């Protein structure tokens, strides 16, 4: 792994659910692992086993039966800085096996995040990890780089937060950004709830991970929700079975599409918000009338929560219903969209024109953490 050029930039996309990390210029992240820190629930009794007081990522996932799992990033905002530091440490030293003090580092964050969040990120990077330079990029702008466009509206939906960001000729239009704190983790929680109605009980943080897996493997978005509900009620054609880790098999039917339907009808989980089709439409309507046509024709989807089968067709149908009747509407859902934020970051950090954008250690020492608002927008 040490074949990397001395100064290759690192790209670290810290999602609420997964950390995607790697080297600028690569076409995919080297390391993808869950953003979790696990701590033992029980007292260690066997001496000399080298038990640790905390586990990060995949190791926490594999030992989840005896751990309490916590996600330090909630709704795109870092809520536990000590755990976040552990995750970054794990990323640099264990996953990428690099010395952060030798590499400029590009981090990502959700749009409309509190300012203090990015200041603290900047401070930790320079003071704890001693990076030579860093930059904080807005997550939703990056998938556009990855799809080779300069104009479009990005719907980025991950585990913690969903947002629409319209971009015209490379400029994000901040007044039209829509943020919805409803994403993959809420869908997992909702699936836990509706599976309980079926008589399957999932309660612990470890069991939530099982439900997440069920969601990722079996859920899909219905083109017509009412029709699909009727089909599910009258036949068992939509039922699928899933084997739990202990060998017990459970069957799920209409839960498969009721779960992601929440994206279009947030009232399912008691949220008073508009669905993702309406936030997309509202975001476009907040933009200048002359550029709307270009946005309608370039709806770019990104993030793990846009990976449901059927979501692009449903989105096409819903936006067509909202938009003027003659409008050409195109939904772009690239197959690699799960990682397109990272891919966009990799492209951005390796552009020659980007090199003067880095915040250097020297600039940080002179201006302090608030420099991040001046240099990263």
From Swiss-Prot:
Positions of modified residues (Tele-methylhistidine): 75
InterPro entries found in the cross-reference section: Actin (IPR004000), Actin/actin-like_CS (IPR020902), Actin_CS (IPR004001), ATPase_NBD (IPR043129)
Modified residues (N-acetylcysteine): 2
Entry-linked Pfam families: Actin (PF00022)
Name this polypeptide is given: Actin, alpha skeletal muscle
GO molecular function per UniProt: ATP binding; hydrolase activity
Modification N6-methyllysine, positions: 86
């Amino acid at each position: 792994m040490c074949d990397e050029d001395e100064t290759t930039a690192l790209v670290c996309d810290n999602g609420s659910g997964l950390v995607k990390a790697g080297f600028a210029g690569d076409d995919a992240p080297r390391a993808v692992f869950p953003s979790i820190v696990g701590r033992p629930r029980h007292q260690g009794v066997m001496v000399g086993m080298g038990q640790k007081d905390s586990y990060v990522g995949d190791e926490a996932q594999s030992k989840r039966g005896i751990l309490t799992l916590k996600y330090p990033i909630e709704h795109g905002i870092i809520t536990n800085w000590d755990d976040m530091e552990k995750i970054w440490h794990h990323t640099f030293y264990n996953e990428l096996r690099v010395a952060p003090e030798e590499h400029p580092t590009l981090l990502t964050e959700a749009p409309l995040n509190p300012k203090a969040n990015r200041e603290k990120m900047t401070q930790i990077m320079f003071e704890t990890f001693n990076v030579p330079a860093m930059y904080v990029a807005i997550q939703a702008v990056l998938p556009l780089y990855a799809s080779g466009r300069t104009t479009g509206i990005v719907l980025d939906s991950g585990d913690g937060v969903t947002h629409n960001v319209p971009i015209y000729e490379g400029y994000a239009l901040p007044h039209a950004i829509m943020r919805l704190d409803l994403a993959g983790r809420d869908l997992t929680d909702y699936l836990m709830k509706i599976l309980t109605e079926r008589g399957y009980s999932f309660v612990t943080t470890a069991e939530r991970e099982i439900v997440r897996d069920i969601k990722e493997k079996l859920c899909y978005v219905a083109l017509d929700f009412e029709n699909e509900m009727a089909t599910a009620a009258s036949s068992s054609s939509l039922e699928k079975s899933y084997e739990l880790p202990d060998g017990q098999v459970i069957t799920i039917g209409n839960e498969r599409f009721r779960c992601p339907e929440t994206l279009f009808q947030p009232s399912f989980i008691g949220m008073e918000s508009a669905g993702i089709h309406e936030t997309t439409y509202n975001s476009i309507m907040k933009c200048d009338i002359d550029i709307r046509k270009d946005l309608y024709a370039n709806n770019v989807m990104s993030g793990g929560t846009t990976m449901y089968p059927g979501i692009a067709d449903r989105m096409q149908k819903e936006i067509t219903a909202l938009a003027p009747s003659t409008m050409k509407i195109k939904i772009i859902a690239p197959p690699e969209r799960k990682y397109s934020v990272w891919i966009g970051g990799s492209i951005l950090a390796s552009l020659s024109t980007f090199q003067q954008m880095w915040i250097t250690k020297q600039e940080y020492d002179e201006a302090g953490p608030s420099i991040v608002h001046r240099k990263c927008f």
